[in-house]
Amino acid sequence: MTIWNVAALTGLLSVGLGAYGSHGLQKRVQDPHLLKSWSTACTYLMFHSLATMAVSLHPVYGKSRWTGPLLITGSCLFSGTIYGLCLLPKGHSLRRILGPLTPIGGLVMLTGWATMLV
């Protein structure tokens, strides 16, 4: 699977999860903060999917072969942990694991962007 395919898959997921957030999530989650977090996760996943697609088409993509994988990994980790935190009930043991992973995903995304500077 190419980086383009992975980016297309994450873009597809962001649209589907965004639709679920708009039409079904309110039946399960009532906290407006969590609903906003879900929306933020969808936005970050979509923007980083598009950025990864653009990077994969860039003629000097090979110069920084880590950019695409870092953007995708970071956005999946960042957004994925937010989705989990929104869906898991308060007090669930996985919440203690997912919470600290969210900013790590953000740092991985930042690293991906930084690789484009060199």
Curated annotation (Swiss-Prot):
Query: Which of the residues are on side Cytoplasmic?
Result: 62-67, 118
Family matches, as InterPro entries? DUF423
Membrane-topology descriptor = Multi-pass membrane protein
**One Pfam match:** DUF423
Query: Would you tell me the protein name for this molecule?
Result: UPF0382 membrane protein C1782.12c
- Lumenal topology ranges: 19-40, 89-96
According to the record, the signal peptide region is 1-18
Q: Which GO terms describe its cellular component?
A: endoplasmic reticulum; endoplasmic reticulum membrane; membrane
Q: What is the lineage of its organism?
A: Eukaryota, Fungi, Dikarya, Ascomycota, Taphrinomycotina
Q: List the disulfide bonds.
A: none
Predominant subcellular localization, coarse grouping: endoplasmic reticulum
Q: Which organism is it from?
A: Schizosaccharomyces pombe (strain 972 / ATCC 24843)
Q: Which UniProt keywords apply?
A: Endoplasmic reticulum, Membrane, Signal, Transmembrane, Transmembrane helix
Of which family is this protein a member? Belongs to the UPF0382 family.
Where do the TM regions start and end? Answer: 41-61, 68-88, 97-117
Q: List localization entries.
A: Endoplasmic reticulum membrane
